[in-house]
Amino acid sequence: AGLDDVTGSDIGRADSGVEGTRTISLGKRELVVTAIANGPTGQDLMVRDAQTGTLFLGDLLPHRRLPFICADLLGWIAALERLSNEPAERIVPAHGPVALPWPGGSAPTQRYLTSVLEDAQVEIARGTPEAEAIQRIGANESGKWLFFNEIHPGNAARTLKALREE
């Protein structure tokens, strides 16, 4: 494929947003799109295909690749707990296999997020200096995730900052 093959093409642009829930009809199939306010970005979506029992969770539930905490960690943990009650046979995560069983497929992400939160709370209570706290927080998750060494220190630092500001 060369430049001539894509000349005149355009990337589709969203023409509407989702607040609450919205149903999209795709011929004989309907997808239910639900806004998740407290997820990894603060403006995430869950898509349900009731016909196949599939939830598309995207970055709400990364798999194998370390979650990137850039919004409300407590809200993300709570959102995953609420979502665990959603009826589904499988989920399609971000950065992983095509499908995972539900709700068990969310366990590693929930474990990591909870570990970061609880460890950060402990280090704050101890008065641990930030550089040392960043090394201790979530240390038990090292080796379980792709890009741990690259992403995790930032997750720990952002979590410490957010908890100290509360």
Task: Walk through the language-model features, giving the residues of each.
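Metallo-beta-lactamase
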Residues: 1-36, 41-42, 50-51, 80, ...
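Divalent metal-coordination and catalytic microenvironments
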Residues: 18, 47, 59, 76, ...
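Active-site metal-binding loops of divalent metal-dependent hydrolases
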Residues: 38, 53, 59-60, 95-97
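Short active-site segment of divalent metal-dependent hydrolases/proteases
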Residues: 43, 62, 98
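Surface-exposed cleft-lining segments at the edges of enzyme active sites
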Residues: 62-68
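Pocket-lining segment of extracytoplasmic ligand-binding domains
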Residues: 63, 73-80
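Divalent-metal (often Zn2+) His-rich catalytic cores of metallo-beta-lactamase-fold enzymes
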Residues: 77-128
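C-terminal regulatory/interaction regions
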Residues: 125-166
